[in-house]
Amino acid sequence: MKASPGARSWIAAGVRHELLTRALPALRHDMAAPISVIRMGLLMLKRQVAAPGIDPEACNQRVDLIDNQIGELIVAIRSLRHWELATADEGITRSALVAECVALMRAAFGMQGIELEVDAALAPTEGETTWPQGAALRYLLLGAMGHLHDSIERIGAIAFAPEGADGLRLTASPRAELASQDPATDLHRAPRALAIDTVALQSLADDLGYAVTREGDVLRLLLGAA
């Protein structure tokens, strides 16, 4: 029995929710870190103001620190809009897409002994093409990463490389034999019931309007709408 378009959209919505849940620790850290620095800065500023002799220069340094961290917090909060599937957004370049998704998931994958390797050809370049629908592309790439993570046993690394002028190639490689013997690396794997399998990834790609293909341990995706 083939899933209806409505059912496919519900599956895709569930996949997007799961991907956001997996990215939340990194997003939470980006917002919590400035708050910790702000609290410490306010405490130090309070002590300096209460001291018998106020040092204006030291107080100004604390104020500058707090102002800087407020700016970092604002950037982190505003980044939440990147997860909204708006009808149109500012778009994203291929290099920025890979950099953002790798930064979001590097710690989580690293805890499981999975390295994320980015080809030098994906470094930012002047005049690089900006692809529309940045939010959709973030979900697509994170979904591809999650699919390889969930579907390949003893995965040790995912390599990111350009595929032509408008695509990405993700290649999974096995974990080193010594690392594969450490059960601690599998403690944080997603429950099988929440695994992003082939049906889940294809439903996500179809709903977002992009082409994704997998051959063995290699997954390819196109950044242009299908």
Spans of features found by a protein language model:
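Histidine phosphotransfer helical core of two-component systems
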Residues: 2-3, 9-12, 16-23, 31, ...
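Conserved ATP-binding N-box helix of the HATPase_c
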Residues: 21-44, 48, 130-163, 194-208
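Conserved DHp (HisKA) dimerization/phosphotransfer helix of two-component histidine kinases, i.e.
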Residues: 41, 58-117
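An N-terminal amphipathic alpha-helical segment
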Residues: 105, 109-112, 145-178
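Conserved catalytic submotifs in the C-terminal HATPase_c
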Residues: 115-128
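Glycine-rich/acidic phosphate-handling loop/turn and adjacent ATP-lid/helix
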Residues: 163-202, 224
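Glycine-rich ATP-binding loops of the HATPase_c
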Residues: 206-220
